[in-house]
Amino acid sequence: MSETANIGDSHIFDGASESELNSNQQERLEQIRSAVEISREAVKAVSITAIDLLKEIPAFMAGLDFETELVNPFAHIEAPIWEEETVPQEMMEAAYAYCELLTRKEAGNFYHSFKYLPDEQRKAMCAYYAFCRRADDIADGDYVDVFPGSEGAQDPEAKEYRESLELLTGDKSVLDAPTYRDKLAQLFFFRKKLSTAYNCHASTDPIFMALKDTVSRFNVPREHLDDLISGMEDDLYTNRYRTFDDLYKYCYRVASTVGLVCIEIYDYDDPMAVKYAESWGIFMQMTNILRDVAEDAGRNRVYLPLEDLERHGIKPSELSGDLANDKRWHAFSAEFIEKIETYHKRALKLLPLLNRKARYSPAAMMAFYGSILKKIKKRDGNIFHGQIKLSKVEKVTLAAAIYAKQRFFRL
């Protein structure tokens, strides 16, 4: 197979959004995305020998300042994949250390919930979090990913990938052309790195080196990680969602897939855990969306379903203003909160189905987001005045209560 999918049988669908594609078109779109691969020919001359690299890693590990520094231990390798058949243990340890440091610096509440997992699961969660964080940062423009040897947005493969998506969907980006092309190219090469986690190669990006070990240990399906990248790509084309079903599909990609990967790492036996993990992601993402309505509207993004807003007489343009005392908003937010609570209740059913040693992590995350939702509800949906978050005291108190419940009581 070539490194990008053959697009000769694609067709042009003028103006079709992804939600309007029929099943065959949708299947073709996913084939194009999932066919992104990296080949052995991508290896270029490495500027340092394996033995020299191994000599440097102990110094790198010893010199890390876990409070301020985040240093890629393999930044000096000028090739996208490791040329040896196996990755030396020292390199793998450095890759996991990098992911854990990134998680400690960026994850906040999430990292706290990871700390009490068994070591192998904690390391895996940090590797997966690092993957998710980088994908999100690329989509938001907060991070510029590097793929050695590529030409960025002008790279022939990246251009072929972009054109294949546009031919199939007819979608036009909501971003300016240079920004759109740059972000999509980065996500394309991010998919290439992901492919190394599931083939015989190993990326020289520490995140994907650790991720390769993680998905192998815990049998994580690639489709969940591909779906998350697809969700980030959706943000390049869509800044409005007509129906709740449209919003649900987006939430599934960027959040439910996270829950589905987490339960593979946490361990479960009952197949119902899969459905509850899906609801877990929907609950957390919908809470985020409601909390960030005003901020997103200021960036010309409205994730709330337009048909539901219209039913309450609310125009998208009003969301960037102040609806705190508006009865229309009170009615809409109460209805939206009720939906979120439904998914929250389903998500809580996941906890008894997980390995007991892993329950604290998801329980803490659910509790933090549940508390944020309660704050919004108590304020009659007023997300327009002040940032809604938990204080440090609230976090510590809540975490202690959840830990005690998981440690000393049966669910």
Residue ranges and their predicted role:
Residues 2-285, 290, 294-411:
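Catalytic cores of Mg2+-dependent Asp-rich isoprenoid enzymes
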